[in-house]
Design a protein with these regions (language model features):
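Membrane-interface transmembrane helices that cradle and orient dolichyl/undecaprenyl
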Residues: 38-39, 43, 82-97, 299-302
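Short hydrophobic alpha-helices at membrane interfaces in multi-pass membrane enzymes
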Residues: 91-106, 307-310
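Transmembrane helical bundles and short interhelical boundary loops of multi-pass, membrane-embedded
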Residues: 303-356
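Transmembrane-lumen/periplasm boundary regions of multi-pass, lipid-linked membrane glycan transferases
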Residues: 119-244, 317-327
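Specific aromatic-rich, kink-prone transmembrane helix
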Residues: 30, 75-92, 104-105, 124, ...
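Short acidic/glycine- and proline-prone juxtamembrane loop motifs at membrane-interface regions
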Residues: 61, 67-74, 111-113
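Transmembrane-helix motifs of polytopic, lipid-linked glycan transferases
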Residues: 18-42
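Short helix- or helix-capping micro-motifs
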Residues: 49-57, 105, 109
């Protein structure tokens, strides 16, 4: 996208950065449309969409990457687009919409390699559990999506491998003869998760590592600033969804939505927590769409959950700021006070205007 923009408008900052901002805006818009499809109530749906879109747009990792020349903006747009296609596929058990899911994820793979496929388990599970058709039909539908994914994500790899090495343009690491498969499966693939090789030394001084473990993403200051301060609120949202499901208060598409976003969030959180290769804190941008969607869904379905999520997010932000010793101590107390005030105002508003 950036290359096309530069060809059209010349090499300048606007040509490089405007496409990233446009893709960020598009990702927010597609997430809003997805939430409208999940929450079909004419009042709750737009509110859930606005909350989800606002969380995505205001998450620091997203705010950074949507104005930076990096593939993450396009990756997030394609992942959210795949979620929209899945939400369209489930109600009618449509293999055509599911094929579009595969195409979008294949393009996400080309954009950021294996990171673009972290949502694959969430999508497959949601369709398997909630598509209103027989198990015998669900398997062929998923197979069609898998074929579409392989074709859309593998055509460029195949072209590079089949192109004569002597005239092959640069692909990765700046060398014309670099094997594309090694890049996708090694340096930019499994090595990022399990370590190995010498990935950290390949011109990425910004790479950041710490001890792998589930607590890394919660207690790491770097990841905390970017997105993980939303995780306590997202956990409250997941618990809310489970309670609503057990009480049979969710429609089929709402249950599918909670499942999709929850598995998306859990898988990405575990991957980022246990990665032993090179890790950049901005990778947590992949958490933002799922966290925003879960928070939006829970907020419109449970008043108490909305209040608890506000307090949980603010409390964890204060903890992270205190651990990182960022800013004066008065800032921490100001955030805590603002969160308490917001929670009280929300509780009063919900009491006075029950339709909220």
């Amino acid at each position: 996208m950036t290359g096309l923009s530069v060809r059209l408008f010349g090499m300048n900052s606007w040509a490089v950065l405007v496409p990233q901002a446009v893709m960020g805006v598009a990702a927010v818009a597609v997430l809003y449309a997805t939430m409208r499809r999940i929450i079909t109530d004419p009042t709750r749906g737009p509110i859930a969409g606005l909350i989800a879109g606002s969380v995505l747009a205001l998450t620091p990792a997203a705010t950074l990457m949507f104005r930076y020349n990096n593939p993450d903006a396009l990756m997030v747009l394609l992942m959210v687009a795949a979620a929209y296609f899945l939400v369209r596929a489930i109600p009618g058990a449509s293999w055509r919409w599911l094929t579009l899911v595969g195409i979008a994820l294949g393009l996400a793979f080309l954009t950021k390699m294996l990171e673009g496929l972290m949502v694959l388990p969430a999508f497959a599970l949601a369709y398997l559990l909630f598509a209103p058709t027989t198990w015998q039909r669900r398997a062929p539908h998923l197979l069609s999506a898998a074929v579409a994914l392989v074709i859309s994500g593998g055509w460029w790899v195949a072209v590079v491998q089949l192109w004569p090495a002597g005239s092959r343009p640069p692909t990765s690491a700046g060398r014309p003869t670099t094997r594309c498969l090694i890049s996708h499966g090694g340096y930019n693939g499994l090595n990022r998760i399990v370590g190995g090789g010498n990935a950290v030394s390949h011109g990425h001084p910004g790479g950041w590592t710490t001890h792998a473990g589930v607590l890394r993403i919660f207690f790491s200051a770097e990841m905390g600033y970017e997105a993980s301060w939303l995780l306590p609120a997202a956990v409250v949202a997941i618990v809310t969804g489970v309670c609503l499901a057990l009480r049979r208060r969710l429609t089929r598409i709402e249950a599918a939505g909670f499942t999709m976003w929850s598995v998306w969030l859990v898988v990405c959180t575990l991957v980022f927590s246990y990665m032993t290769g090179m890790v950049h804190p901005y990778y947590t941008i992949a958490l933002a769409p799922a966290a925003g969607a879960l928070i939006g869904m829970a907020a419109v379905r449970s008043r108490s959950a909305a209040i608890v999520m506000v307090l949980a997010a603010a409390a964890w932000a204060v903890v992270l700021l205190h651990r990182a010793r960022l800013g004066p101590a008065s800032t921490h107390w100001f955030i805590a006070g603002a969160a308490i005030a917001a929670g009280l105002l929300l509780a009063i508003a919900l009491t006075r205007w029950p339709r909220l």
